[in-house]
Amino acid sequence: MPLCSIAKRGKMSGKIEFPEPDEVLTAKPSIKKYLRYLLFFGPGAIIASVTIGQGQLILGPQIGAWAGYKLLWLITISFASYLIAYMGARFMLLSGISVIDLFAIKTRKGFLNWIFILIILIFLPLFVAAIVTTLGQSMAWIFGFGHYLIWGIATCVFAAILAIVGRYRVIEFSQAIFVAVLGIGAIVSVAMIKPDLMEIIPNYFMIGNTPSYPSWVMTEYPSLAEKPVPLLMLGYLGTLTVSLVTLVGYLGWVKVKKWGIFKEKENPDAFSHKLLERFKKTGKIDYLPDDEKEVKKAKILLKPLLLDLMLSFIIVAVVSSAYMIAGAKLLGHNIPSDINLLREQAVIFSSIAEWLRPLYQLSVFFALFGTVYGGFEAVSRMVYETGKDLSRKIERVEYRKFMFYMMIYMLATGIPLAILGYYGLSIILMLSITLLFIGVVGIVIYGIGTVYLGRKYLPEKYRMGKIWYAITILFLLLFVVPFFCFI
């Protein structure tokens, strides 16, 4: 069988032919069509669930309590990570080759891939420790008995087992449910607060506005006041982004979904590998058709990707805004501490109406459990996709087996740090530093590489327009604004 589907009777010898798009993508505009578009929401649900759970419930209300609405602009600039996620996945769905594979080939001994892997292996245990702590606290609070560490460790081990034995479709479906619960909870809470929108909306566009700690923070929370505001800003920005973990994991998930060039392919990984081998021989992507009909077809096949990421960003932005606004309106001087990260935030729901407390508890559980459950898959997929071109051993290992090894590493390193957190190590500080690297620094490096590769290697007809490249670069520049707040 040839490398891939070849155009009829050699009319485009050596060129592939893109598969036909789903009927819904080419149908005439209608309400039914746009409702069916929602069925494409899949990998983006994992991104949304993991993104919200990786720190929104912890840092969002806390920042809202002392900064008010002044840092809502961080949600705006987090859009940069979604643009980068789109560009990276777009490159792969058009060419069949992952940008991560090109990083391995085009940098000295896969230097960039090693940087990504080191960032994950060094900082991931801190993240696992934070999740073990917060998930354990939520479980102990919900059920009313038991030590939070026992709850946290047991629940994380249970989630790891589910992730190993479960199929990707189960993970995707469960994350969609988790996201629905979170979205409903956030919208209900803010709707009942009835905030002043005219006071809130301008803050989304006041890029660079850096508040100082109020005087009451200095006196009532001296340990918080010791932390530089820009560090907390960067940590919070990291909770909003498509992190380095989910950026690379997303490339694997869209292959599993068989979107774009992978549509109708029985083995997307093998197909991608063949195209990569061809690229290694020629040094260019010379197999994409020049025919305008094929180019148009290829771009229509990108619609599921665009819809998936758009829905993901909207959900994350809405939920993130809700928790910061609720923190500003309701928490007052009650900033959540390392010991009671979640319990003290129950006021966000219960002060509105006591019956909303269970909704908050349910939202917390789904957010954190969804992060652990989806996160185990995301981290394993990220390290696997990043490392398979660096090591033949990784490439030869069956993915489920590799995932099991990653689970052991994450639990064996994260649980001891969670225990140290019980003895005084700051969970919020651990989370902020971790998200700074996997949610900000890693994104900037990946983004620069993706923009460069897209312009250099995609044939001109398949590149994004110059305006979109300019917008992406602009948002990347805005993305580093919090770093300048240290000056």
Model-found features: residue ranges?
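Membrane-interface loop-to-helix entry segments
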Residues: 162-196, 202-206, 432-445, 464-477
